[in-house]
Amino acid sequence: MDKTQSRLRRARQTRIKIAELQVARLAVHRTNTHIYAQVFSPCGTKVLASASTLEAEVRAELADKSGKGGNVNAATLIGKRIAEKAKAAGIESVAFDRSGFRYHGRVKALAEAAREAGLKF
């Protein structure tokens, strides 16, 4: 089993437990160059809010700082944006789905920024 399969196995177990809770899910996906966050409905079929480093406003803001989307500063910015968008959609509380990634570095920065911006999980 390679590391990608291991990550997906961990993600599957987390998603099963979150589905039992019947709450909105904040899912995070990261690549070497970008980070993505989406808030899914409790049934898991509809995306209620999303933010990523591919958005034009985010890219413009990151160009002023470091010019890249694959760092902790970018993850912090995405965490704030996803919290604002979720609150605008009427979502106050979510379950955090780290998609099998370790809670460290960019994933941790995104989660902490979302919490500071008022999202509860």
Curated annotation (Swiss-Prot):
<keyword id="KW-0699">rRNA-binding</keyword>
<dbReference type="GO" id="GO:0003735">
    <property type="term" value="F:structural constituent of ribosome"/>
</dbReference>
<dbReference type="GO" id="GO:0008097">
    <property type="term" value="F:5S rRNA binding"/>
</dbReference>
<dbReference type="GO" id="GO:0022625">
    <property type="term" value="C:cytosolic large ribosomal subunit"/>
</dbReference>
<dbReference type="Pfam" id="PF00861">
    <property type="entry name" value="Ribosomal_L18p"/>
</dbReference>
<comment type="subunit">
    <text>Part of the 50S ribosomal subunit; part of the 5S rRNA/L5/L18/L25 subcomplex. Contacts the 5S and 23S rRNAs.</text>
</comment>
<keyword id="KW-0689">Ribosomal protein</keyword>
<dbReference type="InterPro" id="IPR005484">
    <property type="entry name" value="Ribosomal_uL18_bac/euk"/>
</dbReference>
<keyword id="KW-0687">Ribonucleoprotein</keyword>
<keyword id="KW-0694">RNA-binding</keyword>
<dbReference type="InterPro" id="IPR004389">
    <property type="entry name" value="Ribosomal_uL18_bac-type"/>
</dbReference>
<protein>
    <recommendedName>
        <fullName>Large ribosomal subunit protein uL18</fullName>
    </recommendedName>
</protein>
<comment type="similarity">
    <text>Belongs to the universal ribosomal protein uL18 family.</text>
</comment>
<comment type="function">
    <text>This is one of the proteins that bind and probably mediate the attachment of the 5S RNA into the large ribosomal subunit, where it forms part of the central protuberance.</text>
</comment>
<dbReference type="GO" id="GO:0006412">
    <property type="term" value="P:translation"/>
</dbReference>
